[in-house]
């Protein structure tokens, strides 16, 4: 118990039935908490007469969170905070475990992007072994990671964000889901399902199962690719490419109707960070860290991911379990940077595959500088899907891809190792220290969502300032706040190293801290 006494509100049975009936019809599923005063009906939510109204949660993202909006005397938003309220702390679970268990254990952090944790963890273990994995194992790991990017991006765009883009930000909340998309544009919904299935089936063929595979191990992978599995995957490539290309056409033709959102959805100068190849090309597996600023000017290049603590700082705010990561040379307030699809396309010179490079050239024409609006994360995801499919096809046709030598066996030869890779949501770091017996004595994870945390907070503030007027939360305002968070595709289980579905609470606070309006959804 927290020791804080919850106020008791007495409502008549008719009032309760009336409120529940209205909001179940509106599709706002969950419970409501009323406190501090009587309750009356609002237009699309429950409004407290003097202080409180509650929505719970932000929908169509992963994890549990809360948003607080602070109002000045004129009723205008002057500050906003995105709180992550779930906690588990996977690093502490690791202590005392053999380092060889880390990849399979770390994959359990997340059910959406387990492969990213598997790869980053295995790379950290490779550093502990001080081995260079066999070339075929390197290529197979790359295919594995690319397949996960496809399935995760498909989930984010088609299942979670396409209702906003296809149906509009002010659509009936009861229809703002994949079923509403299926009703209005059946082909789009089917394409999203097919792309995710495509990625998941590759993961299953390589790793043995779709969720939490343990195929990537210290020193390489556990089993080689068979000719039958290679051929089966290659047969699915043409359809996947066709879906990716027509999805890009659909998105480019649709986002013209979202000029206001493009202008206000996280559209501000920040740094951008990502891993690139030695030639500056896009990569998800291995390379050096690069930073560019909002003008597209190179800020730092050829940074070794193993030295991340030299250029990245982390800070914990009292209002969130999610760490905020910043670029150390510029400090906490000025070192805001973004990672993920938008950042990767801003820092890369090229994708390195024909179709994706053509789309990247068009994408870069959206602004003369770096592309700043976080609304364009959606566009960037589709370009990356196209790149991943093209790159997998190339790797699967490599003459060495069926080689049987896929693992280097060694004992620990170092007491510290760092592994880094590009997860769907951005750069991921795993850092382990072991004792002489090979047991983990310390672990640190730097997650993409944490690296986007400062930018997400600024984005919520920008959207709220643009759309929140007065002391009531409307559906359109709420959905736009949710939508800008969905653009970043945060994985809150990863960021707090916890498991759970997305729940959200939004509060409007007066200058004296009183809750004016609150919405809670589960």
For each predicted feature, which ranges?
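Active-site catalytic microenvironments in core metabolic enzymes, especially phosphate/sugar-handling
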Residues: 438
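Active-site bordering "gate/hinge" segments
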Residues: 41-427, 447-522
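Extreme N-terminal basic, low-complexity initiation segments
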Residues: 1-12
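Intrinsic disorder/low-complexity segments enriched in polar/small residues
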Residues: 6-7, 18-19, 42-45
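N-terminal basic, low-structured, amphipathic or hydrophobic segments
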Residues: 10, 15, 19-22, 27, ...
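Aromatic-rich beta-strand edge motifs centered on tyrosine
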Residues: 433-434
């Amino acid at each position: 118990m927290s020791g804080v006494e919850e106020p008791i509100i007495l409502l008549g049975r008719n009032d309760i039935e009336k409120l529940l009936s209205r909001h179940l019809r509106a599709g706002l599923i969950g419970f409501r908490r009323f406190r501090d005063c009587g309750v009356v009906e609002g237009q699309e939510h429950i409004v407290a007469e003097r202080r409180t109204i509650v929505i719970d949660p932000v929908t169509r993202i992963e994890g549990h969170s809360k948003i607080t909006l602070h109002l000045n005397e004129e009723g205008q938003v002057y500050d906003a905070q995105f709180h992550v309220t779930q906690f588990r702390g996977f690093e502490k679970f690791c202590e005392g475990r053999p380092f060889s268990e880390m990849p399979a254990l770390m994959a359990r952090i997340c059910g959406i992007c387990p492969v990213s944790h598997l790869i980053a963890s295995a790379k950290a273990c490779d550093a502990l072994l001080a081995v260079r994995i066999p070339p075929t194992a390197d290529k197979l790991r790359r295919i594995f990671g690319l397949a996960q990017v496809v399935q995760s991006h498909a989930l984010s765009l088609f299942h979670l964000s396409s209702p906003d883009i296809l149906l509009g930000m002010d659509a009936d909340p009861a229809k703002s889901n994949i079923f509403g998309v299926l009703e209005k544009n059946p082909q789009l919904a089917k394409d999203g399902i097919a792309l995710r299935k495509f990625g998941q089936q590759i993961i299953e063929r390589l790793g043995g199962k779709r969720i939490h595979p343990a195929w990537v191990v210290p020193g390489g992978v556990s089993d080689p690719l068979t000719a039958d599995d290679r051929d089966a995957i290659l047969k699915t490539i043409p359809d996947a490419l066709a879906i990716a290309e027509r999805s890009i056409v659909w998105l480019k033709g649709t986002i013209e109707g979202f000029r206001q959102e493009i202008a206000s959805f996280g559209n501000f100068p920040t740094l951008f960070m990502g891993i690139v190849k030695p030639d500056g090309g896009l990569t998800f597996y291995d390379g050096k860290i690069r930073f560019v600023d909002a003008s597209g000017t190179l800020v730092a290049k050829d940074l070794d991911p193993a030295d991340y603590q030299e250029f990245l700082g982390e800070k914990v705010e009292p209002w969130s379990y999610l760490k905020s990561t910043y670029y150390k040379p510029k400090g906490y307030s000025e070192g805001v940077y973004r990672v993920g699809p938008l950042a990767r396309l801003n820092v890369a010179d090229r994708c390195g595959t024909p179709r994706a490079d053509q789309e990247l050239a068009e994408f870069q024409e959206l602004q003369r500088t770096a592309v700043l609006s976080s609304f364009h994360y959606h566009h960037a995801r589709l370009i990356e899907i196209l790149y991943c499919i093209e790159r997998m096809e190339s790797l699967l046709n490599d003459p060495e891809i069926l080689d049987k030598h896929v693992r280097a066996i060694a004992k620990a030869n170092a007491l510290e190792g760092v592994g880094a890779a590009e997860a769907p949501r951005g750069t991921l770091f795993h850092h382990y220290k072991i004792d002489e017996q090979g047991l983990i004595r310390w672990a640190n994870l730097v997650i993409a969502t944490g690296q986007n945390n400062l930018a997400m907070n600024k984005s919520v503030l920008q959207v709220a300032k643009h759309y929140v007027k007065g002391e009531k939360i409307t559906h359109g305002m709420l959905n736009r706040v949710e939508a800008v968070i969905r653009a970043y595709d945060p994985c809150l289980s990863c960021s707090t190293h916890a498991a759970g579905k997305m729940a959200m609470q939004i509060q409007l606070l007066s200058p004296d801290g009183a809750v004016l309006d609150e919405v809670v959804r589960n």
